[in-house]
Amino acid sequence: MTVARSLLLFVLAALLEIGGAWLVWQGIREHKGWIWVGLGVISLGLYGLVATMQPDANFGRILAAYGGIFVAGSLLWAVVMDGFRPDRFDIAGALICLVGVGVIMYAR
């Protein structure tokens, strides 16, 4: 599996997990209803499935590396979906996390 495919799987996993959590949030906190919650739960389940498609056999390594993608992806999601404006520390932290992803997954 190529690095590009692995990164694509990480991005897909992030969309499913962050999107799923956002749907649950919208359903409960924003009172949009249980349909939103149900769609969120389905999305979160699909996230778990996508995570299993990574090439490395070590669950801990995959989830640790994915954590960096999740941090950066969550900030990006907030910008696009909620109008959040990250400050320089948000951006710096996300970039540090992405460097960590590279070291954990692809430095070998």
From Swiss-Prot:
Belongs to the UPF0060 family. The keyword Zinc does not apply. This is UPF0060 membrane protein RER_49640. Keywords: Cell membrane, Membrane, Transmembrane, Transmembrane helix. NCBIfam families: PRK02237.1. Coiled coil: none annotated. It comes from Rhodococcus erythropolis (strain PR4 / NBRC 100887). It is found in: Cell membrane. The chain crosses the membrane at residues 8-28, 33-53, 62-82, 87-107. HAMAP family: UPF0060. It comes from the Bacteria. The keyword Transmembrane helix applies. It is a multi-pass membrane protein. One of its GO terms (cellular component) is plasma membrane.
